[in-house]
Design a protein with these regions (language model features):
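Conserved, structured core segments of small domains
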Residues: 1-126
Length: 126
């Protein structure tokens, strides 16, 4: 089985004005979807990310420098992620297509495979 990450992209503030009862229903859909994948042995993990408070770490003059991200100007942000296991790209894409994140028309999911060779080499190196 290969591992993939689903990066959940959305516009800033997508859920800011959603009434509490609707937000609870959205959370319920995400939980049901991820629980279903977990029962099938396809879910490795995932988390919602905070809307603010992140930092960018970049190299400047050869040294890592931290700064607040330009989130206000961002056209989209990563609102969360899931790590899944799938037998191949086709199965991973089918899982991603079913993600409840896609219920909002401005949201999108980025599906990326993990470099399995690098993972295997790291495990072998101990």
């Amino acid at each position: 089985m290969a591992q993939y990450i689903l990066l959940l992209h959305q516009q800033p503030g997508t859920y800011a004005s959603v009434p509490r009862d609707q937000m609870m229903e959205i959370i319920r859909r995400y939980s049901a979807w991820s629980d279903g994948l977990r029962q099938k042995g396809k879910m490795v993990g995932g988390e919602k990310l905070t809307a603010s408070g992140g930092r960018h770490i970049r190299v400047k003059d050869g040294k890592p420098v931290a700064s607040d991200g330009p989130y206000a100007e961002a056209k989209d942000v990563i609102g969360g992620y899931f790590v899944i296991e799938a037998k191949d790209d086709t199965e991973a894409e089918a899982i991603a297509r079913d993600c409840p994140h896609l219920s909002s028309p401005t949201n999108w999911v980025e599906l990326r495979p993990f470099d399995q060779m690098a993972v295997a080499q790291a495990k072998a190196a101990g």
